[in-house]
Amino acid sequence: MAAQGFLLIATFLLVLMVLARPLGSGLARLINDIPLPGTAGVERVLFSALGVSDREMNWKQYLSAILGLNMLGLAVLFFMLLGQHYLPLNPQQLPGLSWDLALNTAVSFVTNTNWQSYSGETTLSYFSQMAGLTVQNFLSAASGIAVIFALIRAFTRQSMSTLGNAWVDLLRITLWVLAPVALLIALFFIQQGALQNFQPYQAVTTIEGAQQLLPMGPVASQEAIKMLGTNGGGFFNANSSHPFENPTALTNFVQMLAIFLIPTALCFAFGEVAGDRRQGRMLLWAMSVIFVICVGVVMWAEVQGNPHLLALGADSSINMEGKESRFGVLVSSLFAVVTTAASCGAVIAMHDSFTALGGMVPMWLMQIGEVVFGGVGSGLYGMMLFVLLAVFIAGLMIGRTPEYLGKKIDVREMKLTALAILVTPTLVLMGAALAMMTDAGRSAMLNPGPHGFSEVLYAVSSAANNNGSAFAGLSANSPFWNCLLALCMFVGRFGVIIPVMAIAGSLVSKKSQPASSGTLPTHGPLFVGLLIGTVLLVGALTFIPALALGPVAEYLS
């Protein structure tokens, strides 16, 4: 079993790096404001037709464009879901959503979280899934990538005030990166057996003679961007464990690759744009070390089996509860870590049925800020915050002004870094406390004791860190939970983007200082260890008390 797990992890990472390297070169061209080959003429026509100016923006203008687009998308999606019954492509005549569920869902998809307090096949029409959710899957992913584009430019430009043009970046990211790759993935899914139609639900007779209604719909097109954009919201309630979304072992492997593809490519792009590819490799090493350790822990915990069932004499050599037999325990464990290391949230197994330790690792990966590969764009700019913090700590230890890529890190940057890092832990801990203090919060818990608290902590961690997966033993479709999680998702997304853009605006105006004998190398194993230690230290200090009340207490009981 250990050899199979090692081979699975090694194969996954090897294929991932091979695919991400050329994509990273393409992203580097876009960051450097160089059109991809053959696209310049098309861009000129599009910019002219849409009235888009390619004049560069300062950080406030860039941020305003990103926020404006997302707020407009939020309003449109909210009213679309409220009035779903008036819109076309609704063969099942599904009614509009309640105001609190519509708000929660709109915020969820605009913030790239894709938390779902509903069952897709019984709640949303084809039009809502396509024109509403799928569109936001593209736009939220493009927004995250645009923010990291601006931050990378801030490190590589000198004595400037501009960070690029948000509209140009968004168009290029959507047209030349997300749309083509998503199309290829969708076609592959269709070839493998995923659904893509507009037929009404099909009534069939089972082999037992009972009647069953099979849901239909344009699944593959949404499934592709759901994974590529690290969105995660499933067309069906069972998400990627549903055979209509994820029909074969091969599509499952491609789904995992799609989740990590752009976050990995952005690391390569960062090193290329910075003029030192070792910087990108340093980030990949730090992310990969944490990732491999976490996968190993989850696989080990799930292979050990459920100790409560073993104590009763049950034949439970491995923990297969809540897992698809066609995928097995090792693949399910790998997928769980992939989807929570990135801010995806898609699932092929029920995380609520994992062992105490097996479920704690995905929860902790979210709580440290989704920086182990992370979401498209958001993962890298989240990790860059920890890079700045690690550089600052190293500067304190050696008595030098901290600097990174030749840019001095001053008080303003560190205040903004601390603010951005503290946003999500504050939301998680305060949100979980509020839920446990109120009857409306506690009434949603379907399990008592430490596991019930773990369900609450997981839900708030998932929302605040824009992941979207869940311990499913929580009845979250209530006004209290819909509003609480919507607030966590909104602040967790934009409460980090705003200080990140402010950091970019501050750094882009600085000159790069040449490296000296006292400069801390930020590309070697020493800094990789320092960066990993910083991530682990912040995560441990912040969440160990809360984890001790949930999964740790459950494991020890």
Swiss-Prot record:
Keyword Cytoplasm annotated: no
UniProt-listed InterPro entries: KdpA
Subcellular location per the Swiss-Prot or TrEMBL entry: Cell inner membrane
Chief place of localization: membrane
Bilayer topology: Multi-pass membrane protein
GO cellular component terms given for this protein: plasma membrane
GO MF annotation: an example: P-type potassium transmembrane transporter activity
Keywords associated with the record: Cell inner membrane, Cell membrane, Ion transport, Membrane, Potassium, Potassium transport, Transmembrane, Transmembrane helix, Transport
Transmembrane segments: 5-25, 63-83, 132-152, 170-190, 253-273, 283-303, 329-349, 356-376, 379-399, 416-436, 484-504, 526-546
Oligomer and partners: The system is composed of three essential subunits: KdpA, KdpB and KdpC.
Family stated for the protein in its record: Belongs to the KdpA family.
Function: Part of the high-affinity ATP-driven potassium transport (or Kdp) system, which catalyzes the hydrolysis of ATP coupled with the electrogenic transport of potassium into the cytoplasm. This subunit binds the periplasmic potassium ions and delivers the ions to the membrane domain of KdpB through an intramembrane tunnel.
Protein name: Potassium-transporting ATPase potassium-binding subunit
Organism: Escherichia coli O7:K1 (strain IAI39 / ExPEC)
Organism ancestry: Bacteria, Pseudomonadati, Pseudomonadota, Gammaproteobacteria, Enterobacterales
Gene designation: kdpA
